[in-house]
């Protein structure tokens, strides 16, 4: 019961952090106002909200959703973006003398998703109430969710790693480049793996054919 109360307290603190980011991220790192468990919960909520948005957004604002929509694809895409961001940021901050550990990066990244969770949920609701002429308000919420989350990510990097604003922005830029590099490497490894499997399958088929004779 105490652990559940602690998690709810940390989730409430995520709301506080969203409007007081510098103090919030400082307290998470040094005053233990957050935990990895709560960070994982926020990640799960983000994935759920993303799926709910894909499936539950009003038809006037959702566009076309395939009948073959696969929730697993959405989850994998989110996890890839999340962890490739964390890995790239960790590698760069190690090189640039950042003070945050990989756990710290995972935590401030997850906590930065709080506005996205709230605003995305609001967008699902209003999309089923608004008419097309009110799309400007829907688009404003959409834009605000990304801008607010990006601001928290920058604030989290600056506070966690003890960077200046200039260094934070430089590391942010190279973190994005790092995500692209990770994606390319994964695609290359996947392509090579496919070729190896195809070659092994061909050799096996040839071997079985010769054995049968």
PLM regions and their residue ranges:
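Phenylalanine-focused residue identity feature
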Residues: 8, 22-25, 61, 78-83, ...
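Membrane-helix interface segments in multi-pass membrane proteins
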Residues: 52-77, 123-146, 183-213
């Amino acid at each position: 019961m105490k652990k559940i109360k602690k998690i709810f307290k940390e989730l409430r603190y995520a709301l506080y952090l969203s409007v007081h980011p510098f103090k919030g991220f400082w307290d998470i790192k040094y005053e233990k106002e957050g935990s990895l468990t709560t960070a994982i919960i926020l990640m799960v909520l983000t994935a759920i909200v993303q799926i709910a948005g894909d499936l539950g957004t009003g038809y006037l604002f959702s566009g076309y959703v395939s009948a073959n929509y696969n929730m697993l694809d959405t989850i994998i895409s989110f996890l890839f973006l999340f962890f490739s961001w964390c890995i790239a940021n960790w590698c760069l901050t190690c090189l640039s003398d950042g003070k945050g550990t990989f756990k710290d990066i995972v935590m401030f990244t997850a906590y930065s998703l709080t506005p996205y969770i709230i605003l995305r949920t609001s967008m699902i609701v209003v999309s089923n109430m608004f008419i097309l002429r009110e799309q400007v308000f829907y688009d404003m919420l959409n834009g605000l969710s990304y801008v607010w989350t990006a601001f928290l990510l920058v604030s989290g990097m600056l506070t966690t790693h003890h960077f200046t604003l200039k260094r934070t922005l430089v590391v942010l830029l190279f973190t994005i480049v790092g995500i692209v590099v990770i994606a390319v490497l994964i695609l290359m490894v996947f392509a090579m793996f496919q070729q190896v499997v195809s070659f092994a399958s061909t050799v096996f088929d040839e071997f079985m054919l010769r054995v049968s004779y």
